């Protein structure tokens, strides 16, 4: 790190620039969402681990998605809740870099996991006879580990580039956590290399994965329409539509934040988009999968039935 960079030992997170009453209202509301996120994704993990009927590649990837959602929420929301109670709460430089790394790592990994889930559905519906041969447990574990590794390595590259920059001027981050773009605005040097790497990452993670998902689901839709059984067609539509809802919410909010012209979205509006990306999406994901997925609802009924009989 540069000589001047050591002058900044902590940052101030400004959070939401609102009145005290509104901040207390948001604290209560966001606390409920936070609890629902942990309980909902925790329930998904519990059902998948306890019900042997859900020990399939599809739910293996879903369990990883639930882990990402829990981890992402734990990384950002407690800091946001603390800022609502105590505005302009400081965070150490090391803590800020750690939060940035984890945020990017979980976000990148979720992008890749959503692609893996769409590929799993593509193989299951378009090549059902070869499904067990293609989607072996060895393949699934390798793909999941690869998604986590790629996400972590790229996040590490971002943080290493940030550590090369001097931070000796303003130390107020106009956000509720150490989001990478907000941190870069405080650097006392040219950040063109950081911006190039961020743009390349956006192309790789926010253009490539949605394109692959759309290609997969175009084949899936064609295959579903050829299914003769009405029950089979309904089950396939139910499973795939839940995944498409999650994909649309996640990538839609991420693309608006990182790829839309910044002049159209002021900083305060960017914070609202980040709420959808890092807060509401993890809350909605278990609801979408439980309400629109018959197998998950069946597993929940069986689990509740065992509890009532015990």
Swiss-Prot record:
Disulphide bonds in the chain: 96-188
Glycosylated position list: 4
Membrane-crossing segments per the record: 25-48, 57-78, 100-119, 139-157, 196-218, 236-258, 272-291
Highest taxon above the source species: Eukaryota
Topological category with respect to the lipid bilayer: Multi-pass membrane protein
Matching PROSITE patterns: G_PROTEIN_RECEP_F1_1 (PS00237), G_PROTEIN_RECEP_F1_2 (PS50262)
One Gene Ontology term of the molecular function aspect: olfactory receptor activity
Segments on the Extracellular face: 1-24, 79-99, 158-195, 259-271
Pfam families attached to this UniProt entry: 7tm_4
Localisation: Cell membrane
GO BP term, pick one: detection of chemical stimulus involved in sensory perception of smell
InterPro entries assigned: GPCR_Rhodpsn, GPCR_Rhodpsn_7TM, Olfact_rcpt
Keywords from the named record: Cell membrane, Disulfide bond, G-protein coupled receptor, Glycoprotein, Membrane, Olfaction, Receptor, Sensory transduction, Transducer, Transmembrane, Transmembrane helix
Residue numbers on the Cytoplasmic membrane side: 49-56, 120-138, 219-235, 292-310
Family according to the record: Belongs to the G-protein coupled receptor 1 family.
Function noted in UniProt: Odorant receptor.
Descriptive protein name: Olfactory receptor 2A1/2A42
Species the sequence originates in: Homo sapiens (Human)
């Amino acid at each position: 790190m540069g000589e001047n960079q050591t002058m900044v030992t902590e940052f101030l997170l400004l959070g939401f620039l609102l009145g005290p009453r509104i901040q207390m209202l948001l604290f209560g509301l966001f606390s409920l969402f936070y609890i629902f996120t942990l309980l909902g994704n925790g329930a998904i993990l519990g059902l998948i681990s306890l019900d042997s009927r859900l020990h399939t590649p599809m739910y293996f990837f879903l369990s990883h998605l639930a882990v990402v959602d829990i981890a992402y929420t734990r990384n950002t929301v407690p800091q946001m809740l603390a800022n609502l109670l105590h505005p302009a709460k400081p965070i150490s430089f090391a803590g800020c870099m750690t939060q940035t790394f984890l945020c990017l790592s979980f976000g990148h990994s979720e992008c890749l996991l959503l692609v893996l889930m769409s590929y799993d559905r593509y193989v299951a519906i378009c090549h059902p006879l070869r499904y067990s041969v293609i989607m072996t447990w060895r393949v699934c574990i390798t793909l999941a580990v690869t998604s986590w590794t790629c996400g972590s390595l790229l996040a590490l590259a971002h943080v290493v580039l940030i550590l090369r920059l001097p931070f000796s001027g303003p130390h107020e981050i106009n956000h509720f956590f150490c989001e990478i773009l907000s941190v870069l605005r405080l650097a006392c040097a040219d950040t063109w290399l950081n911006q190039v790497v961020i743009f390349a990452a956006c192309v790789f993670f926010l253009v490539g994965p949605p394109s692959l998902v759309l290609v997969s689901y175009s084949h899936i839709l064609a295959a579903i329409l050829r299914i003769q059984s009405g029950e089979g067609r309904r089950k396939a539509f139910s499973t795939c539509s839940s995944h498409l809802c999650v994909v649309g919410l996640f990538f839609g909010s991420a693309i608006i934040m990182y790829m839309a012209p910044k002049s159209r979205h002021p900083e305060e509006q960017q914070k609202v988009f980040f709420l959808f990306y890092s807060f509401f999406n993890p809350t909605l994901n278990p609801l979408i999968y439980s309400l629109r997925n018959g197998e998950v609802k069946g597993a929940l009924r069986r689990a509740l039935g065992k509890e009532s009989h015990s």
